[in-house]
Amino acid sequence: MKDPKFTHLYEMAKKELLEDILPFWEKYDVDEENGGFYGVVTREGMPVKGGTKCLVLNARLVWTFASAYRILKDEKYLKLAKRAYDYFCEYFIDKQYGGCYFMLDCKGNAIDDKKFVYGQAFAIYALSEYCRATGDTEARDKAVAIRDLLEQHAYTPDHPGYIEILARDWSYNPANQGSNINPEAEATKTMNTHLHLIEAYTGLLRVLRTPEQIAKVRQHLNIMLDKVYDSEIHHFKMFFRDDWSWTTPEISYGHDIEGTWLMTETAEVLGEKDMEEKSAPKCLAMAAACLEESILPDGSMIYEYNPVTRHINTNRSWWVQAETVVGFLNAWQMSGEQRFLDASLKAFEYIDLFVVDHEYGEWFTMLG
């Protein structure tokens, strides 16, 4: 018998997806003038003239509509997925050097052609899911091509991991490294990029189960568990030098709770008992630390904490609240501990009350 709280959470989430989120993008974001989807729309759903088109958003659109079609079997989502995929392949993929541009203008011209590894990860993730949903192996081949470029140019074998930024031609400039989430941080390697790389490589493993891909996913999981995860405090470190020595003490609770379910998923897809046994206790410990340290009485999760200065960033970001729901739900499924399901449900109730824009649709970006 299913837990009634889980059933309630499931029904709320399903309603939000099918009656708010997906319809908003279908109704307001299709760019009939320039192709693909608008980069920016107003709260009311009006396109912002001249709005740029970002690699991360467009990759996520490919992933979202492909995933929606795979699960819901509704042909309208296949049509939207194909629209997103076709635009992505035509305009974001660099035909000369490979990989993907980071930013386009509204007409599809590259205005930031750097190869952010974080962005390439989203491209692999999107193309892999499109293949998984449609059976189109050409999408998988495109994902593999990007993976191979990352392995050739971004991977650092002396201290296994991946650098942050390369030029359009994949050349590397040590002075041009930094975090996409905090440009001021000293960072050759970051938690955020590696978190999305493990997500991307796991997605590719679902459609490319080769010894090479299995080995890379195993390595990614070990990097997250051994280098990024701090077993003393049960949190991720965020910013690192090339040798994996960390540079700043901040804790990002949203990334932590996101990491708990992503690493669980990776271990499950990998299907190796020793990696599941290594990953599970660390994921649960981090979920417990997030629950104890970052959840406010209303069920929301704070953004960030610096244990040295004791500064707390209490802003409530949309994505942090979404990851709170998923991460605590995963922790409940792993452990059976009711406190995690309660926290997941309360986080979604907070989202429904404050984050969802019930007047115009979709979600607010940030709450104070």
Q: How should each PLM-predicted stretch be described?
A:
Residues M1-G368:
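Glycan-recognition and catalytic cores of secretory/periplasmic carbohydrate-active enzymes
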